[in-house]
C-alpha cells in the first residue's frame, strides 16, 4: 500500500517537472487553477455518482457492521479517484502543449507516456482504463504529427519563404517597404496580385471555361416561399411557372423566313408612308434604320432595308453632305439615269460597330426609332 | 409514342429503327448534318431493340439539350449528378441514356475541346475538363471570367502537396494571413474566404475537408479532392511551386519522386475514367 502511494507521489512530482519543462510559465498558475477547479467539479460529479451507487447498495441486507471487503472497496475508490484525476491532468497538460510537443525536439511526449505507464500500474477498473486509452489515442495522434513534421523538415519546404516568393513572383518586392501588412495595401494592388496569380494558376490547370450567354440568362427569381401547409396545390403550381422562361412554340426555318419577309414588307410600308407624307424630302438612312435603344434591332433594320434596296423599292444615295439617304424609286420617273441604277446592280458592305452606333445616335440626336417594334 | 421495348425475336424490330434513323437523315434540319459524323457511329449502337420509334431528329435534339445542360451546369463547377441529368434532360429517353451521354461527350469534345469525365469510378457524377493544354497567350484572350480565384486554389493545393498531402486548416490560415486573407474578415476579391475554401472548393471537389480526431481546440485538415487530380496533377502543382521559387522541381526530392510516380500511374490506365466506358 505504502509503496503504491510512493509511486503515485513520484508521478506527481514528475508531472511538475513536465510542466516546468514546457515554456508557458506565465500561464501555468492560471491554468493549474482552472484545471483544479475543473477537476473539483468533476470530482463532485463522481462523488454524486458514487454516492448514488452506494445508496442503491444500501438497501441490501448487509449486516450493520463494516465488512472488511467492503472497507477495502472504499479505499480502492479513493485510489481510483486519484488515478482518474492524474490521468485527466496528464491529458489536459499534453493537450495544452500540443504545439510545443509537435514542434520541438524535446522528450516531453515520451515522458508523458512513461508517466501514464506508471499510472496504469494502479489501474484496476474499466473506468480508469478508458482514460488510459484516451490518453494513448492522444499520444499516438501527436506521434503521427511529429512524424509528419520530421518529413517536412527533410523536404526543405518553407511556407514563409513560399509566401514571400509569391509576392516577389508577381513583382511585388517592394511591398514590404511600402506597407507593413499586405492587407493594408491598396485595393488595386490586391486585385492585380490575385489577378496575376490567377492567370499563372490557370495555365497549370485544365479547367474548362464556363459557358455563358452573351446577354446572360433569364433571372431565376426566387420562387416565393412555399405557402403554408393550408394552401392549395394549384397555387404552388402557379408560383412555380413564374420561374420558367417562355417556351419557344415553334422553331422552324421556314417560319423564320416568313418573319423576315413580313418584316421587310412592314418596313417597306413604313418607308412608303413616309415618302407619301413628305414626297420631296428623302429620309436620312441613319435616322431610318437606327434604333437608339437597341443595337441589335438596328442591325436587323439594316438587314431588312437591304432587301428593300435590292428589290428596287428604294435606293440609297449620298446627299450633299455625303451622308446616305433613302429615296423612293419612282416608277413614273424612269429616265436613263435611274434605269442604269436599277439594272446595274451594285453591292455595298455596311459595317457598324457598337461604338459607331453609339456615335451615330449621339451625333444625329436620334431619340426615337423610326421603325418601331412590331411586337 | 411507343415506349415499351419490343420483342427481341420479331424481325420488324431490326428494320424499324433503321428506317427511322435513315429517313430522318435526309429530312433533318441542317443542324443535324453538322453532327453527321457522330450519328453515323451511333446508328449501330442506338438501334438496340429497346429504342422506340424515335426519329433521329428527336434524338439529335436530346443530345443537343444534354450538351447545353452540361455546359450550363458546369458554370458552378459542382459535379453534375447522373440523377439530375436523368431528371432534367433525359426523361423518357432513359433507355438510351448511355448513348445520349456518349454522343454528348463526343460533341463536347469536337466543338469545345472539353472532356466529360466521371469524377470517380462509379460515382455517377461528371465534370468537364479542358482537353486543350493552356497556352500562355490564352490568358489575355480569356477576358474577364468572374472572380480570379484560381490563384488562391493553386496556393492551397501547393501547400497541401508540399506539406505531405495533408495540411491543417490552421496552417492554411497562418499562411494566407500573410497574403491578407483572413478566415473571418471579408476579402475584396474572395468575399468570405473561409466559405470559399472550406465549402465552395469542397463542393466543387477540389478539396477534401475533414475534422482531425482528438484535437482540442477542434481543427480540420485539408487534402486534395478528386477534381484536382483530373484538372491538374502533382507534377504540375510542383512545377508551379518551383516556378514561384525560381528553382527546379528536383530540388524537392521527396515531392518530385511522388509526382513522378503519379505521372507514371496516370500513363498506365489510359481510359479508365472515360464516362463512356463506364456505361
UniProtKB/Swiss-Prot annotation, chain A:
The keyword Ribonucleoprotein does not apply. Residues 42-60 have a biased composition (Acidic residues). The keyword Secreted does not apply. It holds the Pfam family Nse4-Nse3_bdg. Residues 30-68 are annotated as: Disordered. GO terms for biological process: DNA recombination; DNA repair. Residues 23-51 form a coiled coil. One of its GO terms (cellular component) is chromosome, telomeric region. Keywords: Chromosome, Coiled coil, Cytoplasm, DNA damage, DNA recombination, DNA repair, Nucleus, Repressor, Telomere, Transcription, Transcription regulation. It is found in: Nucleus; Cytoplasm; Chromosome, Telomere. InterPro entries: Nse4/EID, Nse4_C, Nse4_Nse3-bd. Component of the SMC5-SMC6 complex which consists at least of SMC5, SMC6, NSMCE2, NSMCE1, NSMCE4A or EID3 and NSMCE3; EID3 seems to be a testis-specific subunit. NSMCE1, NSMCE4A or EID3 and NSMCE3 probably form a subcomplex that bridges the head domains of the SMC5:SMC6 heterodimer. Homodimer, and heterodimer with EID2. Interacts with the C-terminal region of CREBBP. Tissue-specific component of the SMC5-SMC6 complex, a complex involved in repair of DNA double-strand breaks by homologous recombination. The complex may promote sister chromatid homologous recombination by recruiting the SMC1-SMC3 cohesin complex to double-strand breaks. The complex is required for telomere maintenance via recombination and mediates sumoylation of shelterin complex (telosome) components. Belongs to the NSE4 family. This is EP300-interacting inhibitor of differentiation 3. It comes from Mus musculus (Mouse). The gene is Eid3.
From Swiss-Prot, chain B:
It is found in: Cytoplasm; Nucleus; Chromosome, Telomere. It comes from the Eukaryota. GO terms for cellular component: chromosome, telomeric region; cytoplasm; nucleus; Smc5-Smc6 complex. The modification Phosphoserine is found at residue 38. Residues 59-259 form the MAGE domain. Its main location: cytoplasm. The keyword Ion transport does not apply. The keyword DNA repair applies. Residues 52-279 are annotated as: Interaction with NSMCE1. Ubiquitous. Residues 30-48 have a biased composition (Low complexity). Component of the SMC5-SMC6 complex, a complex involved in repair of DNA double-strand breaks by homologous recombination. The complex may promote sister chromatid homologous recombination by recruiting the SMC1-SMC3 cohesin complex to double-strand breaks. The complex is required for telomere maintenance via recombination in ALT (alternative lengthening of telomeres) cell lines and mediates sumoylation of shelterin complex (telosome) components which is proposed to lead to shelterin complex disassembly in ALT-associated PML bodies (APBs). In vitro enhances ubiquitin ligase activity of NSMCE1. Keywords: Chromosome, Cytoplasm, DNA damage, DNA recombination, DNA repair, Growth regulation, Nucleus, Phosphoprotein, Telomere, Tumor antigen, Ubl conjugation pathway. Component of the SMC5-SMC6 complex which consists at least of SMC5, SMC6, NSMCE2, NSMCE1, NSMCE4A or EID3 and NSMCE3. NSMCE1, NSMCE4A or EID3 and NSMCE3 probably form a subcomplex that bridges the head domains of the SMC5:SMC6 heterodimer. Interacts with PJA1. Interacts with E2F1 (via C-terminus). Interacts with NGFR (via C-terminus). Interacts with NSMCE1. Interacts with NSMCE4. Interacts with SMC6. Interacts with EID3. Residues 1-52 are annotated as: Disordered. GO terms for biological process: cellular response to hydroxyurea; cellular response to radiation; cellular response to UV; DNA recombination; DNA repair; positive regulation of protein ubiquitination; regulation of DNA-templated transcription. Gene3D superfamilies: MAGE homology domain, winged helix WH1 motif, MAGE homology domain, winged helix WH2 motif. SMART domains: MAGE (SM01373). One of its GO terms (molecular function) is protein dimerization activity. It comes from Mus musculus. This is Non-structural maintenance of chromosomes element 3 homolog.
Amino acid at each position: 500500500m505504502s509503496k503504491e502511494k510512493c509511486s503515485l507521489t513520484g508521478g506527481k512530482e514528475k508531472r511538475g517537472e513536465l510542466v516546468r519543462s514546457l515554456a508557458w510559465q506565465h500561464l501555468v498558475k492560471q491554468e493549474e487553477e482552472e484545471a483544479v477547479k475543473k477537476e473539483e467539479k468533476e470530482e463532485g460529479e463522481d462523488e454524486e455518482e458514487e454516492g448514488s451507487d452506494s445508496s442503491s447498495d444500501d438497501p441490501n441486507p448487509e449486516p450493520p457492521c463494516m465488512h472488511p471487503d467492503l472497507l477495502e472497496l472504499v479505499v480502492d475508490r479513493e485510489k481510483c479517484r486519484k488515478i482518474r484525476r492524474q490521468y485527466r491532468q496528464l491529458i489536459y497538460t499534453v493537450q495544452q502543449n500540443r504545439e510545443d510537443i509537435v514542434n520541438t525536439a524535446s522528450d516531453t511526449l515520451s515522458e508523458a507516456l512513461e508517466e501514464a505507464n506508471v499510472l496504469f500500474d494502479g489501474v484496476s477498473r474499466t473506468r480508469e482504463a478508458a482514460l488510459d486509452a484516451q490518453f494513448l489515442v492522444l499520444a499516438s495522434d501527436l506521434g503521427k504529427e511529429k512524424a509528419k513534421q520530421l518529413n517536412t523538415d527533410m523536404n526543405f519546404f518553407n511556407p514563409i519563404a513560399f509566401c514571400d516568393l509569391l509576392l516577389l513572383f508577381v513583382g511585388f518586392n517592394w511591398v514590404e517597404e511600402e506597407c507593413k501588412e499586405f492587407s493594408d495595401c491598396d485595393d488595386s494592388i490586391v486585385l492585380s496580385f490575385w489577378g496575376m496569380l490567377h492567370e499563372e494558376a490557370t495555365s497549370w490547370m485544365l479547367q474548362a471555361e464556363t459557358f455563358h450567354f452573351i446577354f446572360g440568362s433569364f433571372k431565376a427569381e426566387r420562387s416565393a416561399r412555399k405557402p403554408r401547409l393550408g394552401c392549395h396545390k394549384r397555387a404552388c403550381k402557379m408560383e412555380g411557372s413564374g420561374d420558367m422562361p417562355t417556351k419557344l412554340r415553334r422553331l422552324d426555318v421556314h417560319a423564320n423566313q416568313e418573319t423576315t419577309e413580313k418584316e421587310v414588307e412592314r418596313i417597306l410600308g413604313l418607308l412608303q408612308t413616309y415618302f407619301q407624307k413628305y414626297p420631296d424630302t428623302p429620309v436620312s438612312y441613319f435616322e431610318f434604320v437606327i434604333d437608339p435603344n437597341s443595337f441589335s434591332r438596328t442591325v436587323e433594320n439594316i438587314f431588312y432595308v437591304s432587301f428593300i434596296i435590292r428589290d428596287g423599292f428604294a435606293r440609297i444615295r449620298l446627299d450633299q453632305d455625303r451622308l446616305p439617304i433613302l429615296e423612293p424609286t419612282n416608277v413614273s420617273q424612269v429616265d436613263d439615269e435611274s434605269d442604269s441604277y436599277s439594272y446595274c446592280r451594285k453591292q455595298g458592305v455596311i459595317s457598324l460597330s457598337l461604338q459607331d452606333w453609339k456615335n451615330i445616335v449621339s451625333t444625329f440626336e436620334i431619340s426615337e426609332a423610326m421603325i418601331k417594334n412590331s411586337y | 409514342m411507343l415506349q415499351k421495348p419490343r420483342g427481341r425475336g420479331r424481325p420488324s424490330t431490326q428494320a424499324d429503327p433503321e428506317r427511322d434513323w435513315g429517313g430522318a437523315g435526309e429530312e433533318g434540319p441542317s443542324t443535324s448534318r453538322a453532327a453527321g459524323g457522330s450519328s453515323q457511329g451511333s446508328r449501330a449502337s442506338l438501334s438496340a431493340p429497346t429504342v422506340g420509334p424515335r426519329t433521329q431528329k428527336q434524338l439529335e435534339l436530346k443530345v443537343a439539350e444534354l450538351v447545353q445542360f452540361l455546359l450550363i451546369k458546369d458554370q458552378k463547377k459542382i459535379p453534375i449528378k447522373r440523377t439530375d441529368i436523368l431528371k432534367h434532360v433525359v426523361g423518357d429517353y432513359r433507355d438510351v441514356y448511355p448513348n445520349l451521354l456518349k454522343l454528348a461527350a463526343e460533341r463536347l469534345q469536337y466543338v469545345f475541346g472539353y472532356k466529360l469525365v466521371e469524377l470517380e469510378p462509379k460515382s455517377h457524377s461528371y465534370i468537364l475538363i479542358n482537353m486543350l493544354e493552356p497556352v500562355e497567350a490564352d490568358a489575355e484572350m480569356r477576358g474577364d471570367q468572374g472572380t480570379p480565384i484560381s490563384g488562391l486554389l493553386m496556393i492551397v493545393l501547393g501547400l497541401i502537396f508540399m506539406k505531405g498531402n495533408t495540411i491543417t486548416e490552421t496552417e492554411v490560415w497562418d499562411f494566407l494571413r500573410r497574403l491578407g486573407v483572413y478566415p473571418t474578415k471579408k476579402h475584396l476579391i474572395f468575399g468570405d474566404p473561409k466559405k470559399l475554401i472550406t465549402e465552395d472548393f469542397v463542393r466543387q471537389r477540389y478539396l477534401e475537408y475533414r475534422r482531425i480526431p482528438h484535437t482540442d481546440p477542434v481543427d480540420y485538415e485539408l487534402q486534395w479532392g478528386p477534381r484536382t487530380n483530373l484538372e491538374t496533377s502533382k507534377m504540375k502543382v510542383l512545377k508551379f511551386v518551383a516556378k514561384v521559387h525560381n528553382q527546379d522541381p528536383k530540388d524537392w526530392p521527396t515531392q518530385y519522386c511522388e509526382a513522378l510516380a503519379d505521372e507514371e500511374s496516370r500513363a498506365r490506365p489510359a481510359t479508365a475514367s472515360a464516362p463512356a466506358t463506364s456505361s
